[in-house]
């Protein structure tokens, strides 16, 4: 068994499992709690603890969490080299290798993100049941101001129909549009097959992940 360890955002679970099967990765795989998404500081602390507690013979720790909320900035490779995707967030991870330009002012979904939304305070289905459709629509228009374009990222690892059925009521509330975009998640293949190029951040043992590793990457932009 490999002495490599993966710690991944749970929203990438199906895609990562597909890459594991394709590459034959045989190391440890751990999925982080979805609750960490709402607290970058806690995400950072949890990741650092996992790194610090890795076995002395660990060859590499692969962190499938990117620049999300700067949660990975400052991570110290105390026990083993680190490898991370050079991306702003999980959306960029999923779009990597597809050749698609990330649309501005857009909301992106997969089944993983749908499940995250359902468990959050922004679950429109729950809000409709509690407040009614009209009050929910008013609230959502305030929350999603500037965002009307929705994209389902089709990574061909799940059925997109339930995602469409879930999100369409929200799209209609916002007078928005729903489109599909292809997701190749190529950087996950690079992380697992050992490719270390410009798309991968490599931190040697004893090093620290500096914020400059994300220079040139563009955060989400609200459409004018």
Question: What does each model-identified segment do?
Answer:
Residues 7-14, 36-37, 61-73, 88-89, ...:
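Gly/Ser/Thr-rich loops at beta-strand to alpha-helix junctions
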Residues 1-23:
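N-terminal basic/disordered segments at the start of proteins
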Residues 26-42, 180-184:
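A short beta-strand-loop structural module common to alpha/beta enzyme folds
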Residues 105-173, 182:
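Active-site rim beta-loop-alpha module in soluble metabolic enzymes
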Residues 182-224:
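C-terminal accessory domains and tails appended to enzymatic cores
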Residues 78-124:
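Long, charge-dense
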Residues 37-43, 91-98, 162, 190-191:
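Short, charged, surface-exposed secondary-structure boundary motifs
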Residues 45-57:
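Short, well-structured alpha-helical segments in soluble
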């Amino acid at each position: 068994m490999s002495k490599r360890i993966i710690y991944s955002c749970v929203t990438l679970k199906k895609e990562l499992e597909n890459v594991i099967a394709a590459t034959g990765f045989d190391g440890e795989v751990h999925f982080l709690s979805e609750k960490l998404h709402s607290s970058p500081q806690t995400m950072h602390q949890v990741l650092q603890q996992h790194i610090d507690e890795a076995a002395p013979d660990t060859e590499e720790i692969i962190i499938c969490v990117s620049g999300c909320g700067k949660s990975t900035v400052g991570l110290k490779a105390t026990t083993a080299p680190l490898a991370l995707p050079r991306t702003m967030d999980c959306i960029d991870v999923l779009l990597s290798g597809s050749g698609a330009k990330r649309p501005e002012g857009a909301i992106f979904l997969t089944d993983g993100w749908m499940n995250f939304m359902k468990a959050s305070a922004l679950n429109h289905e729950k809000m409709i049941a509690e407040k009614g459709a009209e009050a929910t629509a008013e609230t959502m228009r305030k929350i999603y101001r500037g965002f009307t374009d929705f994209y389902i990222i089709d990574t061909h690892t799940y059925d997109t129909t339930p995602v469409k059925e879930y999100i369409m009521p929200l799209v209609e509330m916002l007078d928005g549009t729903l489109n599909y975009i292809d997701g190749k998640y190529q950087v996950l293949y690079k992380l697992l097959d050992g490719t270390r190029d410009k798309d991968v951040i490599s931190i040697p043992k004893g090093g620290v992940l500096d914020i400059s590793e994300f220079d040139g990457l563009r955060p989400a932009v609200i459409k004018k």
